[in-house]
């Protein structure tokens, strides 16, 4: 005996529409998650570029390598391009997906991060330009500078790691590390001021 379908045509239409809408929502969520995963990958890549810029800038200062300094200046355009690519992806996520709450905070945080990382590239290029055009005497102060460079590289790595993993503990360590870098900066500045005062002609 055939089983009668008790749904009216209108009810069946509503049910089909609901199924289609749920499928559309799932598809949009999957696409959004895929784009977020891509965002994470691109942030990791940009973080690596910034770490390399810091490391190479320290080497350039240590060795007064003018040719390597020119490479760092050129490398800044790669970091700038990475920033633009990530910014475009974030804008696409905001316009197409219209994220709210946690998702919106995630995209907004990425936009803030790339601004700060792009600034690292700019600073590295600025230092490289100085090395390429002037004599920077190598002294004991380079030890402090090396500590600053290593601490800053670790901060970049940990900050991106905290973002990707959503790890509050790592984020707190990054905040604490900033105090260490600030202390090294003050120490370095005092040493440089002492040198200038003792050798005003060189300053």
Map each language-model feature to its residues:
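Compositionally biased, intrinsically disordered low-complexity regions used as flexible
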Residues: 1-7
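Cytosolic, long alpha-helical scaffolding segments
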Residues: 7, 19-203
